Amino acid sequence: MRSIRTGTALLSGLMLLGIATTAEAQWADRRVTIEARGGLNVPTFDISDAVDAGPSFGVGAAVQFAPKLWLMGDVDLGFHSGTNLVGGGEGPDVNVYHYVAKLGYELLSEGQSPWSVIVNAGAGALTFDVDGAGSNTYPAINVGAKIGYRLSPRVHLLLSPQGDIAFTDDDEVGTSNAWVWPFTAGIRIGL
């Protein structure tokens, strides 16, 4: 009787270990990703009176720490020319650098289809580097999404529409909140 219990316990333990190992191996396939993106940085509301939309380049990294939760970090570099002034001429060029940490929630997992959708929200900072006037960094918040299409088990095409709002100084930037939207596309690689 004792050997049957021992055998049953041993068999149950091995089965649980096998199931856990299989689940971990499947889940661990792409727990860490890196991405490179390019696109357009679009200013809106008051900041759009000072600068035009301009090219944007970005990189990001993400770690999946639970089956549907991701910890992400993005850096986007936007290059904006100054807008045309009423009296003629053009305002100064402004480079906007975005540094944002985010929490992402996976709405559509890549195991369900070749598509994946992660919505994200986070906080960080935006630096406004005004040509000829120095730079200032302000706290910022972020919302957005990461929409991927699987090309291979580790490579995805990526769309990354993001909305960043910096809480700026009206005297330095001309508005108390600068809304800048990096709309980028690129590639995401699972490590």
What name fits each language-model region?
Residues 26, 55, 60-144, 149-151, ...:
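Gram-negative (and chloroplast) outer-membrane scaffold detector with strong preference
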Residues 39-58, 136:
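Surface-exposed strand-loop-strand hairpins of Gram-negative outer-membrane beta-barrel proteins
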Residues 161-162:
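Internal, hydrophobic beta-strand segments that form the core of beta-sheet-rich folds
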Residues 41-44, 85-86, 126-129, 166-169:
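Extracytoplasmic loops and strand-loop junctions of Gram-negative outer membrane beta-barrel proteins
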Residues 3-6, 31-32, 38, 65, ...:
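Positively charged, low-complexity intrinsically disordered regions
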Residues 47-50, 169-176:
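A short acidic/glycine-rich loop-to-helix N-cap element
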Residues 1-30:
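Cleavable N-terminal export/targeting peptides
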Residues 27-42, 117, 121:
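Transmembrane beta-strand segments of Gram-negative outer membrane beta-barrel proteins
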